[in-house]
């Protein structure tokens, strides 16, 4: 019995190899990692070599000083990741010191989140230390995420040769030159995410030859900004929350294979659609106003389309036809329907709406290569037998339309 008690209370974790201990501790909050130093002599210095660090401030006035003291004791020469999240206002000098420490430790993934502002203004934003980025002394940084009250002022071109992913979330730019100098100094950039919010800049230019994935979300609520995209290597494009799609100008994207369009209220300028000629996968989140026109434009602009996904999780009663308006079929059947479309998915299909029934019938009637079609609809209560039977009739009709043109796998789901 005594031997069993000793076995159950044995400190077997401390017997692990130090490299494995460090690996385990890298997944824990940094505050917890430091607390392990009091467990035993063996644990006293293990935390000093952990390479994944995350510091979160909850309005702690001495937070910056605490982080400085931590790094004075921390011994790891390289950092895999450093995540700094501030809830209290931070001076530009403090931000510069912290970023300088990160660069000196050859950080690979850096996250800075200064979410302390009460209003969206450059006056309370801390300036990112641009001087640390203009020299060829940072060869390890691969991912950079900047959020909220950070002012990006780059009077000179940066030198971030290893940066592959950049995420800019509601930050402030000191003019279009700062945007240009930042993006032009990232020759290895592959993935760019830009989420803008009431930023007063007429033109936002994204000219990155190496860029493969681009996500743009604009929450400006009509403030207006024109996006100019020049990315000849672009393969994936995600556009969200544009009030007007004609505010996005794509100059060159011959490699584009997948595109997603979400919450776009209107489309007038067809320029952006010219870049979809090579797209094979297209996903559209249906918006309240004339969504069928957007779909028609997309189908006509994507002759090589193989996968089409339509999504309307809101199932809004305001979406679709207004009085006196109706969907107008394309003059000619789009090439993608005639030769290439293999998968058609409609999530949130409103089978009771005339416009949606017309669109579904048109697509199924004109596809010749369709292999699978999936329609997800809102569930119906069992007591509503008449409604249930009517829906089944509509869905059976759609299935027969598809099978009349080609053998397909039809799936009907409730969401």
Swiss-Prot record:
Keyword Repeat tagged: yes
Keyword Repeat: yes
Matching Gene3D superfamilies: 1.20.1280.50, Ribonuclease Inhibitor (3.80.10.10)
LRR repeat positions: 60-86, 87-114, 143-170, 171-196, 213-241
Stretches assigned to the F-box domain: 10-58
Residue ranges annotated for the FBD domain, each copy included: 272-377
Keywords: Leucine-rich repeat, Repeat
Pfam families for this protein: F-box, FBD, LRR_At5g56370
Designated name of the protein: Putative F-box/FBD/LRR-repeat protein At3g49040
């Amino acid at each position: 019995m005594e031997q069993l008690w000793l076995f159950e209370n044995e400190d077997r974790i401390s017997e692990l190899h130090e490299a494995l201990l460090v690996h385990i501790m890298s997944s824990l909050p940094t505050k917890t990692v430091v607390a392990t130093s009091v467990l035993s002599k063996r644990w006293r210095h293990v935390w000093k070599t952990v390479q994944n660090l995350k510091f979160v401030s909850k309005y702690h006035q001495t937070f910056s000083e605490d982080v400085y003291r931590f790094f004075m004791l921390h011994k790891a020469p390289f950092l895999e990741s450093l995540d700094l999240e501030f809830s209290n206002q931070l001076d530009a000098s403090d931000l510069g010191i912290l970023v300088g420490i990160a660069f000196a430790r050859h950080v690979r993934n850096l996250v800075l989140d200064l979410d302390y502002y009460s209003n969206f203004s450059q006056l309370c934003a801390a300036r990112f230390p641009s001087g640390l980025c203009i020299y060829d002394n940072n060869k390890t940084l691969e991912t950079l995420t900047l959020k909220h009250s950070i002012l990006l002022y780059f009077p000179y071109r940066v030198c971030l040769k290893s940066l592959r992913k950049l995420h800019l979330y509601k930050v402030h730019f000191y003019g279009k030159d700062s945007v240009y100098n930042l993006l032009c100094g990232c020759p290895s950039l592959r993935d760019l995410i830009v989420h803008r919010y009431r930023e007063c800049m007429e033109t936002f230019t994204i000219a990155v030859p190496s860029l493969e994935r681009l996500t743009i979300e604009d929450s400006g609520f009509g403030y207006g900004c024109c996006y100019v995209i020049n990315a000849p290597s672009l393969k994936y494009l995600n556009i969200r929350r544009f009030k007007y799609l004609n505010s996005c100008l794509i100059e060159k994207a011959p490699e584009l294979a997948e595109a997603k369009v979400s919450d776009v209220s209107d489309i007038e300028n067809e320029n952006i659609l010219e870049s979809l000629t090579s797209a094979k996968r297209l996903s559209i989140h249906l918006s309240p106003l004339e969504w069928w026109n957007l779909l028609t434009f997309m189908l006509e602009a994507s002759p090589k389309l193989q996968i089409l996904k339509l999504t309307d999780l809101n199932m809004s009663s305001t979406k679709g036809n207004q009085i006196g308006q109706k969907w107008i079929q394309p003059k000619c059947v789009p090439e993608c329907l005639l030769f290439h479309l293999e998968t058609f998915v409609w999530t949130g299909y409103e089978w009771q709406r005339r416009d949606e029934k017309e669109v579904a019938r048109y697509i199924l009637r004109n596809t010749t290569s369709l292999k699978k079609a999936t329609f997800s609809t809102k569930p119906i209560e069992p007591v509503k037998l008449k409604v249930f039977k009517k829906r089944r009739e509509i869905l059976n009709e759609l299935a027969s339309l598809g099978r009349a043109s080609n053998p397909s796998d039809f799936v009907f789901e409730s969401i």
